[in-house]
Amino acid sequence: MTPKTKLPQHKSGEFRTKNSRGNNQVKAEPASPPRIIGGDLKGRRLAFWPGGPTRPMKDRVREMTFDLLGTAVRGATVVNLFAGTGALGFEALSRGARRAIFAERHFPTADYLRRSSRELGLVDRVDIIPGDVLLWSRRMPPLSTESPWIIFVSPPWKFFHTRLA
């Protein structure tokens, strides 16, 4: 039996880097409001709480993800678990997804998802499920078989840290 490895603790808005001597350092990087990078809503910003617990996925990572998915997004139903800013789901809607389901356990962040859906004019294509994401995913209603599904799971760092500690 192997002992559990103690993972380094990260604070919101920080990441680890190595300096020229190979020592780990924590460097704060300010989070900026996420924007949609492709599709019909390209350039539009999402509602974002800069002091909140959410750290948006980098534009470049999202761009590579959607480059890999290509046209598979068109007409799909997207499920965005641990939605945070909803950047993945809103990006998919901008690129032609039929609808998006956002599950977010942090209630104030879920309110920001509602705000983004209103500001982007997507209220009729979005369902927001606030509460325990894992519990909801176990009881998730059956998804329609009329369209393909794409499921994004992007939990916060603290989620893994608390599960492995």
Regions found by a protein language model. Give the residues of each.
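Class I S-adenosyl-L-methionine-dependent methyltransferase catalytic core
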Residues: 1-165
